[in-house]
Amino acid sequence: MICVGNIAVGGTGKTPHTEYLIKLLQNEGINVATLSRGYKRKSKGYILATAESSVQKIGDEPYQIKSKFPDIRVAVDENRCHGIEQLLTLKNPAVDAVLLDDAFQHRHVKAGMNILLTDYHRLLCDDALLPAGRLREPACGKNRAQIVIVTKCPDDIKPIDFNIITKRLNLYPYQQLYFSRFRYGSLMPLFPEKAKGRITCTGDEQVLLVTGIASPAPLVEEVKSYTPSVSLLEFGDHHDFGEKDLLLIEKQFNLLKGNNRLIITTEKDATRLKNHPNLNETLKRNI
């Protein structure tokens, strides 16, 4: 079992790192499964995802993973021990490794490898316990990790920054430290059959950036590197978009000037928007 998690609330990039690990393990011929509690899903108990599973049934992050890796087992269960037991009973093929999403503080599970993520812009050594800060437990909890990854590093990070952060984190010899950064992919229409024309940014677009993630700042910076005209419409992490939210998105989109307008959202948010019954044609053409 491999646990990927953090000790701070908010986004550190668990899902992209989980997807990266899936690819690494698959390349080694390992039959991998993922298990999470399925945060904000509208169901309970153990569910093994299928191609027909909805985002409401399993949650946005498991839905995203199952969509990108249809051949692996993706399960949700608020009882991690029970979920692991169920996955390990599966055959043809049997599960060789289980990736546990956000289970770093689940003390009933003893993972063979614990990977702890910490945001470059808010290192755990600079943080404080809730409610003064964002830590769920004291920073010394990092000592349970065999691997620590500093995520969301800027492209221009310098060697001296590596040295400074290494000293400040003050890890033990048994712990390995890595640094990672996001590499954003190309823009993709949420509804290809309805998209109008090109979907590239050339610098003259008016963009409405819709996010429902914990830390949108790096994404905002990325989008602004393509076009300066970016309006941010920010919702809470894992936000369950309602009819009023869609009306607000359309209203903000209509406030953009000119004909070269675009709505950009994240891959995770797209899972919650795509099958929404109240998503109208205007939004479908422009997201």
What is each of the regions a protein language model found here?
Residues 1-51, 155-156:
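Walker A (P-loop) phosphate-binding motif
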